[in-house]
């Protein structure tokens, strides 16, 4: 049997055995079960099939009960979602009808995953809960805190952000003022195109570990499923920006039609659930979550990839212009 290590950049170590099984070795150990192990078990138990099959895990028992590895079926794929989307954007400044159909399908698959995660259960870690006014206020307060930290961090390099402070707070405060609707559930927590795979003309979603910088307790927190949606929408923007940086020019609006197709697929597949905010509040919630994501991106790019700072800054300026 063959053994090889996956060499792409990641926060864990992945080893493929005989091109049939992949084991992820968890580098950052925390107390309790890793969220990927928990999420994989729940999704498998309740019939979600659009993910690599969970085969098992390794748990360190004793005083420190921790997941040290998770094992999945190794899936031979056409590409991951990031490579696929960048390829589509390179091929044409306007997404093709077939590409938009596949993006619409991706939205539907995410909605199906969220519907499974909203399955009634006696497990308190996964039982869906109604969103309360206190949740909306807490989320908005956290976003406003992140906004202050981000602008303080970026004000010297990106002085135009100072004028965005009040308009962005106004948008975030709309979230806090909503009448609560929809459910909060366990969700992916770190969703982007790189966490999806194209296989046999369909989509798989994987890597349910959540953001590695967060503790297990933080990663288990329930939230509106639109948090995952916001992450995917930002990934579309990054794929387009990557192609523009390669070409040295800003192309036509690739992202707009892609967003619309994804949201159309997601909302259509969610109609039979009570997961989402009421229709008139959907955009308010989603925009606040996108702002939260963009603020994180700006802090990350300033620390790790200064040449990419323009991507989140451009989004914030477009928000101010009402686009």
Task: Please describe what each predicted stretch is.
Residues 1, 146-186:
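An alpha-helical support segment within catalytic cores of ATP-dependent transferases
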Residues 39, 135-138, 142, 160-174, ...:
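Exposed alpha-helical structural elements
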Residues 1-152, 193, 199-275, 279-282:
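Conserved ATP-binding subdomain of kinase catalytic cores across diverse folds
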Residues 187-194:
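Canonical protein kinase catalytic loop motif
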Residues 180-186, 199, 220, 285:
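Alpha-helical hydrophobic/aromatic positions enriched in membrane-embedded helices and signal peptides
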Residues 98, 156, 304-308:
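Alpha-helical structural elements of signaling/regulatory helical domains
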Residues 249-253, 257-274, 284-323:
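ATP/Mg2+ or Mg2+-diphosphate-binding catalytic cores
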